[in-house]
From Swiss-Prot:
Species whose genome carries this gene: Saccharolobus solfataricus (strain ATCC 35092 / DSM 1617 / JCM 11322 / P2) (Sulfolobus solfataricus)
Transmembrane spans: none
Name by which UniProt lists this protein: DNA-directed RNA polymerase subunit Rpo8
Molecular function per GO: DNA-directed RNA polymerase activity
Main location: cytoplasm
Length: 132
């Protein structure tokens, strides 16, 4: 389910895997979210997530409420890349930089920016909240 209310996008997700990142003390969390594949970098010392956990992702222009059980950061939408070489349509990769930590949103159907009404260089908050 993808909800979009006043520049706030809410995705229901399940964590598929947590992999070692390419830098020391960095992990990459991979999730399936309502037709999107979302991955984000997280520093090992603040990683509070586990595989198969159900979470909610919020991408918002306004600072959302959060608790110590959530991961939240803010940064900018850097780019959206389109790969038309796939046999079954277009693949879009949207990249958000949280001042160094990266968030990648991959869609095999349509542009995430177009469906969410966001633009490159928009300042956004990215939160991953545990379903309690």
């Amino acid at each position: 389910m993808m909800e979009s209310v006043a520049q706030e996008i809410i995705l229901s997700c399940e964590i598929n895997s947590i992999e070692r990142g390419s830098l020391k003390n960095l992990s990459m969390v991979n999730m399936s979210c309502n037709g999107f594949n979302v991955s984000f970098d997280i520093i090992d010392s603040i990683n509070i997530f586990s595989q198969k956990e159900k979470v909610k992702v919020i991408i918002s222009k306004n600072r959302p409420s959060y608790s110590h059980d959530d991961f939240c950061g803010h940064g900018y939408i850097v780019t959206e890349l389109k790969d038309s070489s796939l046999n079954n349509g277009n693949k879009y990769t949207t990249i958000i930089s949280l001042y160094g930590l990266l968030v990648k949103i991959i869609s095999n159907k349509e542009s995430f920016l177009r469906t969410s009404q966001l633009n490159i260089m928009d300042h956004v908050y990215f939160c991953v909240k545990k379903n309690n």
